Amino acid sequence: AHRDHAQGLSLFHENFPQIPIYSSKVTKEFLKLQDFLPLCHVLPWRSPVEVAPNLTIELFPSGHLPGASSILLTYLTSSRPYKVFYTGDFSLSKFQLVEGLSLEELRGITPDVLILEATYGTARHPHRRQQEKKLIQQIDDILASEGNILFPVPTLGIGQEILKLLRSHHQFTGRDLDIWVDGKLIFACDLYLKLLREFPSSVQNFANHQSLFWDEQICPRMRHFAEKKNFPLKEKPCIILTDQIEDFTPYFQSHPGNWTVLIPENLTLFFNAKYHHFLALTQPQNVPLETYLLAEHSDGQNTTQLIHNLRPQHLIFVHGKTEYLTDLASLEELQNRYQLHIPTIGTTIELPIGERFIRPQNLPQAYYEGEIKEEENEVIINVSREIQKDIRWHNLADTGIIEARWQGNELVLRGLSQRELFRYKNEGQSNVFDLDCSGNCLYHKNQQCYNPDSPLYGLKVPFEGYCPAFE
């Protein structure tokens, strides 16, 4: 029911009204939030339904979001059945409000074709509970410094996950704290409450003992704004979640304290228009913009686990940056077993079933030649500027400072974020981080670097940031 999947439904239905649209019960309700009339035919979970002669469709809960579905299409012929499994957006991890895609339920399906979303490519993430623990600590640190927090979130999904986490985590149970919700997020939360019977039993049990969302009695209190311009906030620090992202000024002006805006980490990985929009809203008011990780899709490890459990003949990667899809399709463990495809617009893909396995041609991977210079007190690694053309370069070079470690006989480089640098400094790990503070630099103005000789030139740099070109 996320907008990137649902935005074309109305136009599709207008042009092809005779074609039925199928969904899960929860998705049909959620589509009301996307201004799409609920014209869907609801299908039950885990029950094949014949939608055309010899063609059945079966839905499986895919994790990611309540109601999100993976789809098994089976076409029966006199010789054999042909199966296509489409994951949709999926996650194997258990979230606060939704179970992960069950590998046990899929055992034995063995589709001929697997169409797989691969949003994160080969990236590996910490366990879901570790992600939540880190976010809770991040929130706690900001509140401890008397700061307020604003979460701009989508209408569905991660916002409700954060609300449930704050309501149930032991660090916040009974805490004198106000959590406010604004925008369409209010109606989305009401829909969650209406559909509680469709949620995991653990969520239903929690809701039987205390309200899942709205509660002004049990701390932390959770409320919503009755009117757009009426923010009855107290002087104590608070948390606001909203899907209204056009202007943050009313929120910042509603409370005299300092503010921090927290956004999902994935928004900074590419030249994301929404990330730059958030920068434009926060920089002029000197409001820090920090990131957190609550992954909504499976990482590379869980993605390959699903592939090996289903054992398809053909594997089609979709729903991700080309670089990430290519990384995943370049894994030797996949190339040796499956026929791999990355489709492009307007190109037909042939999927011969049952024929002899043909090892796919190696997909082009970018390698960058360079040289090593050994100086008296340091080692310099030079590579071609071609490396900057990759969309991942921006994330690596964000602060201009990297961390290097050995992995077998290979040297792995990783860019360090401003938050990591600040943490290293606080923990007394000075070494390469013992640099002058950006806030005292001649070229640091309005939380931005204006030094053309700095690797941070043109980027947002908070006061505690570090730069090797400090002056």
Regions found by a protein language model. Name each.
Residues 121-124, 214-215, 235-238, 286-291:
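Short, basic, glycine/proline-bearing loop/turn elements
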Residues 2-180, 186-189, 196-199:
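His/Asp/Glu-rich metal-coordinating catalytic cores
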Residues 96-119, 198-205, 256-284:
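Short, compositionally biased "basic patch" segments
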